[in-house]
Amino acid sequence: MNAHEDGRLSRRRLLQAALLGALARTRVAHAQEFPTRPVKLIVPQPPGGAADRLARIFAQALEARWKQSVVVENKPGGGVVIGTLATARAAPDGHTFALLGSSLSINAAQRKDLPYDAARDLGPIARVGYFTVVLVAPADFGADNVRELIAMARKNPGTLSFASNGIGTSAQLAGEMLNHMAGIQLQHVPYNGAAKMYTDMIGKQIPLGFSVASSAESFIRSGQLKVLGVTSKERSPLYPQWPAIAETLPGFEAVNWAGFAAPAGMPRAVTARLADDILAVLATADVAKAMADMGIEVRPQGPDEFQAFIQSEMRRFAEISRPLNKPSN
């Protein structure tokens, strides 16, 4: 290479470096200016539920932080597919993001009819925590813990069943994971919500159920139901008296998480700004108390850690799921 060519190459490298530097400064500037207009927070569930309440807590706090309105838009239907698709199709500029949950991972593992690719079309922002999910039984059920339940199920294969609040929920996956890891055959009975499930359990129509602790708590306190274990990998700080199923089956974890995601392709600086602000809100005493009152454990994760968590969930759930292969109603 002669001196002229070497000089020309050096100028190209300098120009490339200058362009990259300008691009980086532009992205940082965009993140600092964000948001420049009202922000839409999509919730793929109907108004009034736990996800809707949680979204509105964060929307109010972020609105005060940004001095911009944050509008919660409920888009239920299709087993959260409608709201998730609307998020995936939005402009990746940070002005539309969503509060999603375990159904994102479960649908990706179970369903073949999704109009989006959860791993490719969405960008995780931050996980905020998860609902404590419990395995409950009627007070006079013949097992008082998971170890005794496994022994009972092995002695009487295929005779015990567990209830959940529906197909494709974290409660169903918790039961299927228990089957998978313990080598037992509990039959799944899906319910349309938890109210009828509790009635049937108390009435001895079904012996076991997985549910969110906060919704079962009144029945547990009254002595009508008892807790055999929680589905998180360790005891819940909200309910430390209840053992984790993982104490009997190491590695067991099937949580009903809550976190925020945006359309894929969002500038990393904007993702970082969103994550920083969401996690800052999460760290405030008022929000932490509101989440505890809802039975949600604070378990924060930033974008990279959250993405790795979702991918790990998809792999684990794919191992144990029976594909639905049909659209949700």
Name these PLM-found stretches.
Residues 89-95, 109-196, 245, 250, ...:
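Hinge/capping helix and adjacent helix->loop/strand transition within the periplasmic-binding protein
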Residues 99-104, 164, 194, 211-216, ...:
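Beta->alpha turn/N-cap motifs
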